[in-house]
Amino acid sequence: MSSPSSPFREQSFLCAAGDAGEESRVQVLKNEVRRGSPVLLGWVEQAYADKCVCGPSAPPAPTPPSLSQRVMCNDLFKVNPFQLQQFRADPSTASLLLCPGGLDHKLNLRGKAWG
């Protein structure tokens, strides 16, 4: 059972975006917050077909509207490579954010739609 105060988080990123209806590779960034600083735990690859799904896979539970909203593949946003380096993620494999509302607010997003 996980609680809202759990130090573990899952963030979804799109690794290789395709048009709606195509399969897209998705990576879930698992990180732990220690003393206010996020520490990268690892990447877990998942695959979604048709439309991109917002948020990590989880049993149905009450969630804020911003997290339950589905996002189309062409509505994704790029993550600032400088911020990716804070997680020791390689900017050359830069990920696209699946769920803008679900990302940690401390990450700096560029307001550029990918499409």
From Swiss-Prot:
Domain of life: Eukaryota
A GO term from the CC aspect: nucleus
Tissue: Not detectable in normal kidney and liver. Up-regulated in chronic and acute allograft rejection: expressed in the inflammatory infiltrate and in tubular epithelial cells.
GO biological process: apoptotic process; canonical NF-kappaB signal transduction; negative regulation of apoptotic process
Keyword list, A-Z: Apoptosis, Nucleus
Protein name: Putative TGFB1-induced anti-apoptotic factor 1
Protein's organism: Homo sapiens (Human)
